[in-house]
Regions:
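C-terminal interaction-tip segments
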Residues: 1-31, 96-109
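Surface-exposed coil/turn segments at beta-strand junctions on protein surfaces, enriched
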Residues: 31, 73, 86-88
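Noncatalytic modules at the cell exterior or secretory-pathway interfaces
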Residues: 36-38, 85-99
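Residues on the solvent-exposed faces and adjacent turns
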Residues: 42, 53, 97-99
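Short, surface-exposed beta-strand/strand-loop-strand elements in extracellular ectodomains
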Residues: 44-64, 104-107
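Short proline/glycine- and polar residue-rich coil/turn motifs
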Residues: 69-76
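Exposed aromatic-hydrophobic patches
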Residues: 77-85
C-alpha cells in the first residue's frame, strides 16, 4: 500500500516575506495553498503572525487571512492547528511577523 500526500512544509522565515516552498531545489512563492498548521518560536513577548492572501508587502487589510498572537517571553513555541481543510490562499501568502525567531507553515501546496 502506498500513501500519496501533498502535505508539505514551507521554507522557514525569520523575517517578513513571501512564504515559499522548495521546488526542484529552488525556493518559489507559494501561490495556492490550504494552510493546516502554523508553527513559530517567539523572540520576545507578544509575538504576532499575520498572513495575507497576496504577493508583495502591501498588507491589504481585506487580504488578511490569519492573525495569531502568542508568547509571554522569548523562546516560546506555538503551533496553530487549523481545523478541517485549513485556511485557503489562492493568490500567494505574505507573512508579517513580529517578535518571532522563525516561522513556517504546513499545508497542501
Amino acid at each position: 500500500m502506498s500513501i500519496t500526500s501533498k502535505v508539505r512544509q514551507s521554507v522557514v522565515l525569520a523575517a517578513d516575506g513571501q512564504v515559499q516552498a522548495l521546488v526542484a531545489g529552488s525556493a518559489a512563492n507559494i501561490t495556492k495553498a490550504n494552510i493546516m498548521t502554523i508553527y513559530a518560536q517567539a523572540s520576545a513577548a507578544d509575538a504576532e503572525i499575520k498572513l495575507y492572501n497576496e504577493i508583495g508587502d502591501a498588507k491589504t487589510a481585506s487580504a488578511l487571512i490569519f492573525h495569531g498572537k502568542f508568547g509571554t517571553a522569548a523562546n516560546e513555541i506555538m503551533e496553530f492547528n487549523l481545523p478541517g481543510a485549513g485556511i485557503y490562499a489562492n493568490t500567494g501568502i505574505y507573512a508579517d511577523v513580529t517578535n518571532c525567531d522563525f516561522f513556517y507553515i504546513v499545508g497542501t501546496f
